[in-house]
Amino acid sequence: MRPRIRDVSDKLRPNRASFDDGETKFHRKHLPPLRTMFGRWRKWTVLVAAIWIQASTGTNFDFSAYSSHLKSVLGISQVRLNYLAVASDLGKAFGWSSGIALGYFPLSVVLFAAAAMGFVGYGVQWLVITNIITLPYSLVFLCCLLAGLSICWFNTACFILCIRHFPNNRALALSLTVSFNGISAALYSLAFNAINPSSSNLYLLLNSLVPLVVSFAALYPVLTKPSLDTTPDYDSRRHDSHVFTILNVLAVITSFHLLLSSSSTSSARLNFIGAVVLLVFPLCAPLLVYARDYFLPVINARLNHESSGYVMLNIDELKNQKTSVSSKTGYEHMGTAKEGNTVRLGDEHSFRLLISRLEFWLYYIAYFCGGTIGLVYSNNLGQIAQSLGQNSTTLVTIYSSFSFFGRLLSAAPDFMHKRFRLTRTGWFAIALLPTPIAFFLLAVSSSQQTALQTATALIGLSSGFIFAAAVSITSDLFGPNSVGVNHNILITNIPIGSLLYGYIAASIYEANASPDITPIVSDSIVCIGRDCYFKTFVFWGCLSILGVVSSLSLYIRTKPVYHRLEQDKVSLTSSYKDLDPL
């Protein structure tokens, strides 16, 4: 008789005999020991700390809120102002330095190095904009570059925290924390209205101080060592699932609160306090789950009784277990990197192989003509609002909030996979559709406040989805182990697009500024009227159509790849069940 192969996942499976003993007896479930509860709670404080860091460090999104004031103080043209926005985006080109630093220094050192760079980068700009000191344009450019680099270092610290402490749920942890980066501008706008809504230089002071303060607040969770138990039991997995659900609900509530608060100025301080409470409240989420399990035992027991008895396993963990078992039983490891001598999509790609792929360039163009245009639009919101006589703070908040919604929606392929058989690249193509619609709406009726706000919301929604979904698509198509390098190659389109699109927009802006009707403040030209950005909106709209076409081509070419990956997962799961029958 062939012996049963046992592995660490046995403890994840409920005993089927417990469902066949006749009438189920429901009883109040005992709370776990305080030491266990505290250990689990500490793990969630790490995720909450990452959320705080992300929510406070998306400082590049509020550039448009103070850019007009900075332009006036420096006495520069619109083109040179655009170069400052490019400098902030150019920091992404040096983001690899944070990975090297992690090889030599603890994570806490990397975190505070990022805080120090942001403190200096934004702090010096605040000293310049308040006329405390005077600096040449080149040094201000370097400060913008340093501030942009600090954001990359903060992001790296958050990614490492999620990967170390949530190895079985890292995709959920990463998507949740990255989403909060999208609400930074709305959060800073609310703080701006609560403190002093008449001084736009306050944004730079907040950008300098808040991430530093948050880094000190997050120090204790950052120093927490990850759990050694990489295969938690059934109760732990169910507990984690419920906590993630609560955190996602709180994320949506927080975003709605920030969005609705942007239109209210009379109770700005109360709204800001409410936002802070919503950011702190996730610390209570694990305790709510414990209370639910304790006070609603009958409901929980019935749900467990009526369930199928199967437990969802992490696919990466499943692959590792399958590999170890296969080495003992003669089963071949599935999902090999090569088929003959040809590397397929979905396998690991080197740099040379990556840039030789047509699919990569379709992906690059789709991102370049989609998400990057949305980012450049957000950088120009200050001048767009000024030229149309609108409030830039409101537009920044709308863009930030809907960018956050887009980032949350990027998880749709995982939750709706069984209902809608659409690949990630298909969702990516759909997410690009609102962008050309929004720009042509702006070209036709940008002078109307409703049209301007609607278009801004559509662009924020589209670009937010693209920013968050791109990491998963890169991993799917070009290999998960190479995603760090390959994704950094992909996002080189951001500084290129920021420079190109921003320069074109600035040139059109200055060409339509008539000295006879346009005031000149500190040698900087200010354009007023619909014509300032009309041609820019048309140009961006046409380019975004190219992005949609490119994304559709990518979707068509990658459908077989996702079908093969899905079959591999099904085969892997079936093989695992054959090796370990119940």
From Swiss-Prot:
Protein's cellular compartments: Membrane
Pfam family, one: Nodulin-like
Residues bearing glycans: N391
Swiss-Prot/TrEMBL GO biological process terms: karyogamy; polar nucleus fusion; response to salt stress
SUPFAM superfamilies hit by this protein: MFS general substrate transporter (SSF103473)
Keywords: Developmental protein, Glycoprotein, Karyogamy, Membrane, Transmembrane, Transmembrane helix, Transport
Primary location group: membrane
Domain of life: Eukaryota
TM regions (residue ranges): 46-66, 100-120, 132-152, 172-192, 202-222, 243-263, 270-290, 358-378, 395-412, 425-445, 458-478, 489-509, 536-556
Region (Disordered): 1-20
GO cellular component terms, semicolon-separated: membrane; mitochondrion
Membrane-protein topology: Multi-pass membrane protein
Function of the molecule: Required for karyogamy during female gametophyte development, when the two polar nuclei fuse to form the diploid central cell nucleus.
PANTHER family, alphabetized: PROTEIN NUCLEAR FUSION DEFECTIVE 4, UNCHARACTERIZED NODULIN-LIKE PROTEIN
Protein name in the entry: Protein NUCLEAR FUSION DEFECTIVE 4
Organism: Arabidopsis thaliana
Organism phylogeny: Eukaryota, Viridiplantae, Streptophyta, Embryophyta, Tracheophyta
